[in-house]
Amino acid sequence: GSHWLRGTGYHESVLGHLDRQWLDTWAPDRPVRIQHRSGRLWILNSLGMEIIADAALSLAPHERDRLTSKDGRLYDVDELLGNLTRSDAPPVRLASQQLAAFGVTGINDMTPSNNPETWQWFTELQISQDLLQKVRMSGRPELSGGKQTPRLSIGETKVHLHDSSLPNFDDFLSTITESHKKQRNIAVHCVTEVALVYTLSAFRTAGTLHGDRIEHASVIPPALIEQLSELGLSVVTQPNFVHERGDAYLKDIPADEHTFLYRTDSLIRAGVP
């Protein structure tokens, strides 16, 4: 075939280091893009990088720069890549029918980039009955102005933090306070201690609203448990990752930090819901 070959779920613990050269060796004649399990990283082969470079000519210079990499490893470009590589609309009708067949009647969409255009698209999908499920949509602060219906409702303001590019602190505070003014909760993606400390500091400054939460909270040192409790924040954790990825954690995480990973009982005992 000549179309994109797309893979997801890559992690170093499974395949080691993956880059443009490796993909060129194994798939030189077809454009390939592989997504890291974290969701932050895409790795492309040379043919894929050439296609993206041509498609990106219409973009602003700073956007083209984000899509340039000698080793084919592109960080935090999910939305840009999607816009450049998607030639056809995703098969929503088929996916929705399959979900309905399994008895799924509602979807909670936590995509951080959801915006008014996404809201309008989902509205149209429901009107056309391509999308049968009810949807609760979280995303950007601008979603607060969406016209809700019995089948489409507004969720949290979703903030996805990366240690390498944390948002301006004042901007982060503004996002929290403006969302709270509209009685909209905040859901913050935190998978590192740095991100969690940054988030707790922001909530301590801006204040919390019942229902604000930390998503993942992958690493929680003991000193931060009390702060979570004091601020009244909830935590949505994933202890199943300890089972699924435990071998990698044993290798990559210092032994004295193993108890910090995906806490459950210690949070419950501290009164953190």
Protein language model annotation of sequence segments:
Residues 1-131, 137, 142, 155-191, ...:
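Divalent metal-binding segments
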Residues 43-44, 147, 165-166, 224-225, ...:
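Short, charged, surface-exposed secondary-structure boundary motifs
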Residues 119-124, 146-148, 196-207, 227:
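Distinct, well-ordered alpha-helical segments
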Residues 127-132, 205-210:
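Short helix-capping segments at alpha-helix termini
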Residues 149-162, 231-243:
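Non-cysteine beta-strand/loop elements that form the S-adenosyl-L-methionine
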